[in-house]
Amino acid sequence: MCRKEMAKRGLPDEDVLSRVAVVTNRHLAARPYLEQIRRVCQLRPEAVIVREKDLEEEDYARLAGQVLAVCREYQVPCVYHTYPEAALRAGVDAIHLPLALLKKYREAESLKEFSHVGTSVHSVREAEEALRLGATCLTAGHIYLTDCKKGLPPRGTAFLQEICALADVPVWAIGGIHMGTGQMKEILSCGAAGGCIMSEMMRI
């Protein structure tokens, strides 16, 4: 999709989208789920992280496989979540794990075949632990106010800056990030590689 067509549809600029990792949530999709995934992939984001963490592994693998097919059609990297075995069966070498699962699988030496191992961190201590465990990417949050974390104050850009200064791997911001608000520019100025966006990308 060219810049002119994107502008006509009121979509964000492709330069911004190249710094966005889309986090999926089928419960928020504005249209049928795979149709929404296709729309997202047409925008060429940095990656699509198939979160859907409420699913058991068999159901997750089935759905993630459908998302993967769309991602491959548009040459958008696809990152699986929670289930490394499902990822490997699908030929995916990128996984995002909660910190507790990263520790579990790293101790079991189950992550050797992955080139990308991401995890979420919410404190400096967690970031240090994730780096010790060999994470190749950190997601730090939540940075801004978000309905996904109702009642919890955001950690803010000072926290993001601290994690970016600490880490020798890419750090992605997450939580309450909206395009067209100046937030992307703000998180990039903190040293982040980009921003993870769920709600807005599931409704775009």
Label each residue range with its predicted role.
Residues 37-44, 69-73, 88, 108-112, ...:
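Acidic (Asp/Glu)-rich catalytic clusters
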Residues 90, 94, 118-165, 204:
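Glycine/Thr-rich beta-alpha phosphate-binding loop at enzyme active sites
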Residues 18-24, 48-50, 78-80, 95-97, ...:
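Hydrophobic faces of well-ordered beta-strands that scaffold small-molecule active sites
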Residues 1-36, 109:
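N-terminal amphipathic alpha-helix/helix-capping segment at the start of soluble metabolic enzymes
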Residues 47-59, 142-149:
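Glycine-rich, proline-tolerant flexible connector loops at the mouths of alpha/beta enzymes
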Residues 22, 98-108, 137-151, 176-204:
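Glycine-rich phosphate-binding active-site loops on the catalytic face of alpha/beta enzymes
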Residues 61-80, 99-102, 107-123, 153-178:
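Alpha-helix-loop-beta-strand connector modules within alpha/beta enzyme cores
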Residues 78-93, 122-135, 166-197:
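Catalytic cores of alpha/beta
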